[in-house]
Amino acid sequence: MDMKKLMLVLGLCLTLTAAAQENPLATISHDPGWCTLIHRWGFIGDSLCSGEHEYTRADGTKVWHDVYEYSWGQRIVAAVGGAVGYNFSQGGETAKGWIRNFWDYPMNRNADINAQSYPCQAYIMALGCNDKHHIKVGDARKDINLEDYTKNADTFAGYYGGIIQRVRTLQPKAPFFVVTMPNLYGDKEFSAQIRAMADIFENVYVIDLEKYGPDYDTPEFRARYFLDGHLNAAGYQLTAWMFMTYINWHIERNLPAFARIGLLK
């Protein structure tokens, strides 16, 4: 091999290595890493945030249960150790519905938990799977009124941003980790609006499952990690590992932003 070809090969190898290093989920760790800095977590979402299990009875009828103790959020809390986490989530939830069911008039399947009563040090937000069937996606840069969230537009982007704004009235410095939807559940336009939150608000970080997550629709993945149409216990545990890996990646690159995390009450 002449020197020119050798340099081309080395250059390609370096490019591929750099690309792999920029993939936060290139290697999924079971270790919570820097997630241990956060001792009080809030989990905002729908069925996939609630550990929902789906199965079919012998008579063919479907059953859905929010099994919170198996949710990825509670698996993160267990891995961190000495932490607490609150599931502000339920099956079928949307961004618009969340504001009603967990903020304005708390009536939900998690014992009517009120998100205003449990301010947290950090939040993971995973909504959108149900929204895409019920509301226009909107444009976060136009639909979010940074001065008055009650004037946000009647769109997914408006309500999603409104959740961050409402929670920030309790915890102005709390970091948010917003999750794009895996390809099986997602919609590119909705995921684009979720990513936009990191450009609009400070201290918001994207967990980009649409871009870096596994393919949820392969026969092997579904056999291992699904129970009918939702994840099984192993699937929620895998999700917890992915989220911890991704959050650790973000914190490692932004440690100064987390310098005062221990002072958030």
Language-model features: locations:
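Hydrophobic h-region of N-terminal signal peptides that target proteins for export
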Residues: M7, G11-A19
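Serine-esterase "nucleophile elbow" of acetyl-processing enzymes
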Residues: Q21-S89
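Positively charged n-region of N-terminal signal peptides that target proteins for export
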Residues: M1-L6
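Catalytic His-Asp segment of secreted/periplasmic serine-dependent ester chemistry enzymes
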Residues: M181-K265
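Active-site segments of SGNH/GDSL-like serine hydrolases
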Residues: C129-N130, Y160-I194
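Oxyanion-hole/transition-state-stabilizing segment in secreted/luminal serine hydrolases
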Residues: A95-D154
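Alpha-helical scaffolding within the catalytic cores
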Residues: T27, E69-G73, W98-Q116, G158-R166, ...
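Structural recognition of the beta-strand scaffold that forms the well-ordered cores
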Residues: R40-G45, C49, V84-S89, Q121-L127, ...
